[in-house]
């Protein structure tokens, strides 16, 4: 049996989330679906529109088998910390596949971006330089990616 992992905020839960769950249930009929979900606060410390209990009920009602709350200390951080700790939780729970949705449906572009972020020393050096320009991680992250890719 496959144990499928999903990482989400469900803020709010929408048709794309429902489609995601339905597609997983159709493709992996005998699977168990584990969701790592933010609680009252979201990535970068924003307050969730829906409280964690209601988000959990919605997830369970639409076919998620197990919901695990991502602790605030990780869930309110930048995307890399959010993702790293979410995946760590899923790994500790024995998840065999992690499935995510995508607006672009372009896995090659995602792979290219990940390789740049992980392996390109010039990119890493530019990130360090831009830390001093912007106060918010998300702002300098976008700035450096723009300058790196387009200039």
Residue spans of the language-model regions?
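N-terminal catalytic cores of NTP/NDP-binding nucleotidyl/phosphoryl-transfer enzymes
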Residues: 1-52
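Active-site cores that bind ATP or allylic diphosphates and position pyrophosphate for catalysis
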Residues: 64, 69-151
């Amino acid at each position: 049996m496959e144990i499928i992992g999903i990482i989400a905020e469900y803020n709010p839960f929408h048709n794309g989330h429902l489609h995601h769950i339905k597609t997983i249930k159709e493709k992996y009929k005998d699977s168990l679906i584990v969701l790592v979900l933010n609680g009252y606060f979201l990535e970068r410390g924003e307050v969730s529109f829906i409280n964690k209990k209601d988000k959990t009920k919605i997830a369970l009602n639409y076919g998620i088998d197990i919901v695990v709350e991502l602790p605030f200390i990780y869930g309110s951080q930048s995307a890399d910390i959010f993702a790293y700790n979410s995946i760590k939780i899923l790994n500790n729970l024995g998840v065999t596949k992690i499935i995510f949705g995508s607006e672009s449906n372009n896995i090659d572009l995602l792979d290219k971006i990940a390789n740049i972020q992980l392996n390109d020393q010039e990119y890493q050096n530019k990130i360090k330089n831009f830390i001093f320009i912007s106060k918010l991680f998300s702002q300098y992250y976008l700035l450096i990616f723009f300058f790196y890719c387009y200039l």
